[in-house]
Amino acid sequence: MDQKQIEEIVRSVMASMGQAAPAPSEAKCATTNCAAPVTSESCALDLGSAEAKAWIGVENPHRADVLTELRRSTVARVCTGRAGPRPRTQALLRFLADHSRSKDTVLKEVPEEWVKAQGLLEVRSEISDKNLYLTRPDMGRRLCAEAVEALKAQCVANPDVQVVISDGLSTDAITVNYEEILPPLMAGLKQAGLKVGTPFFVRYGRVKIEDQIGEILGAKVVILLVGERPGLGQSESLSCYAVYSPRMATTVEADRTCISNIHQGGTPPVEAAAVIVDLAKRMLEQKASGINMTR
């Protein structure tokens, strides 16, 4: 699917929702609108600031303008320079700061108050705490007994599409992108004439937990929005895993269709919502997902 097709899907879905389509988006770079690149090292520099991200560590460059343009065009670690065979102090400190940020978002919990504020039913997997979640991924693939009963009692049965939100490995991905992806996604699915299930939040969930959810609720399509494993300096990336007629015993990873890198610096959440709506419609038409779908 090329950019033109994606933009057409966005316009179509937004028009059906009675909203103006957003302007065609471009991949955003965190350094695009930052201050002029800095070449000197400073202990007082905030390592998470735009100034630190724009820092150029190459001393006495032959073409400083080329390095400046390169630095502004990407969030990758370029133009950091060297001190002999080793990285410069500023580059190393920023690397460590970004690594710490990534670890923090993995270990953080989605606040219960936040879940209640969104009006979401909260259930959990067989995991009871974050440490167990990181060490026993198999337990994160199954709902606890209380969760199974809650879904049967409080969720719409036999929906065309069931939307599930889970913290996964990034709390920030859920809390930052939620407002921009779930409302347009739910509205788009309903505008398409589909029976949409009750959206809910799964704490400590892994991707395969959507198979059990689909089986319990009798959903034709299950869409799981889950926090991605964070990269260095990027802790807000969300993924969508969609699967048709999932079954715990027979569904394999190749049966899933994944849309990753959903965040303001990648695929914008509103745009992703429109693409997911179109994907769900095609899954229902073809009665397939993953590698079984025709392009």
UniProtKB/Swiss-Prot annotation:
Pfam families xref list: EutC
Q: Where does adenosylcob(III)alamin bind?
A: V207, E228, C258
Q: Which reaction does it catalyse?
A: ethanolamine = acetaldehyde + NH4(+)
Per UniProt, activity regulation is:
Inhibited by 5-adeninylpentylcobalamin (AdePeCbl), a cofactor analog. Irreversibly inhibited during catalysis by cleavage of the Co-C bond of the cobalamin coenzyme. Reactivated by EutA, which probably involves an ATP-dependent cobalamin exchange.
Q: How is the cofactor bound?
A: Binds 1 AdoCbl between the large and small subunits, with 6 cofactors per holoenzyme.
- Induction comment: When grown in ethanolamine and adenosylcobalamin (AdoCbl) (at protein level). Note this experiment was done in strain JM109, which expresses the eut operon.
Q: Which GO terms describe its biological process?
A: amino acid metabolic process; ethanolamine catabolic process
EC number in record: 4.3.1.7
Query: Which cofactors is this protein said to need?
Result: adenosylcob(III)alamin
- Which superkingdom does the taxonomy of this entry point to? Bacteria
- Reply yes or no: does the keyword Cell inner membrane apply: no
Give the record's pathway: Amine and polyamine degradation; ethanolamine degradation
Q: What class of enzyme is it?
A: lyase
User: Which cysteines are cross-linked by disulfides?
Assistant: none
GO molecular-function terms, A-Z: cobalamin binding; ethanolamine ammonia-lyase activity
Annotated localization = Bacterial microcompartment
**Subunit-structure text:** The basic unit is a heterodimer, which further associates into a trimer of heterotetramers. 6 large subunits form a core ring with 6 small subunits projecting outwards.
Q: What does it do?
A: Catalyzes the deamination of various vicinal amino-alcohols to oxo compounds. Ethanolamine ammonia-lyase (EAL) allows bacteria to utilize ethanolamine as the sole source of nitrogen and carbon in the presence of external vitamin B12. It is spontaneously inactivated by its substrate and reactivated by EutA. Directly targeted to the BMC. May play a role in bacterial microcompartment (BMC) assembly or maintenance.
Q: Which NCBIfam families match?
A: PRK05465.1
What domain notes does the record hold? Partial trypsin digestion of this subunit (removing the first 28 residues) yields an active protein less susceptible to aggregation.
**What is the protein name given in its UniProt record?**
Ethanolamine ammonia-lyase small subunit
* Source species of the chain: Escherichia coli (strain K12)
